[in-house]
């Protein structure tokens, strides 16, 4: 668990599914498109998988006053994704979530951490550059890669 100026960061647990679902439900269509590469409305079942079966991933949450304002998941292959509630963006929450995912990857012996995003997801690209990811830009997607080993 990590805390920074009113934000608590911790591994998600089974009781968090509703808060994560509410977080995703608060997102605009554009935000959902940036996160999933499609206009994808996440289901309760998909959210429950994030917090009930950790066999192939680890999910962490950012919490302020018992409200989940950010969620990040890293899979065992090193790929990760995250989302921060629109009202809490540009406060370092996304950056801190990625730093935590990098620590988790190191503990699991994952040598390469990566993200895929769309070219107009400037916040994610900015976080990647700030944290030392190599950024490869194509016209359809951006790949961020960080070698840990």
Predicted regions and their residues:
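Conserved GNAT acetyl-CoA-binding A-motif
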Residues: 104-118
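Acetyl-CoA-dependent GNAT
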Residues: 26-81
């Amino acid at each position: 668990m990590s805390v920074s100026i009113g934000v608590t960061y911790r591994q998600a647990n089974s009781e968090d599914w509703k808060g994560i679902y509410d977080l995703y439900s608060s997102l605009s269509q554009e935000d959902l498109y940036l996160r999933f590469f499609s206009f994808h409305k996440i289901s309760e079942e998909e959210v429950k998988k994030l917090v009930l079966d950790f066999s192939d991933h680890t999910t962490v949450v950012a919490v302020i006053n018992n409200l989940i304002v950010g969620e990040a998941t890293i899979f065992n292959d090193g790929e990760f994704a995250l989302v921060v509630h629109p009202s809490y963006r540009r406060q370092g929450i996304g950056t801190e979530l990625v730093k935590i995912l990098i620590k988790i990857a190191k503990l699991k012996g994952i040598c390469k951490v990566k993200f895929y995003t769309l070219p107009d997801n400037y916040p994610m690209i900015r976080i990647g550059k700030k944290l030392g990811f190599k950024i490869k830009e194509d016209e359809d997607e951006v790949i961020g890669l960080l070698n840990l080993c």
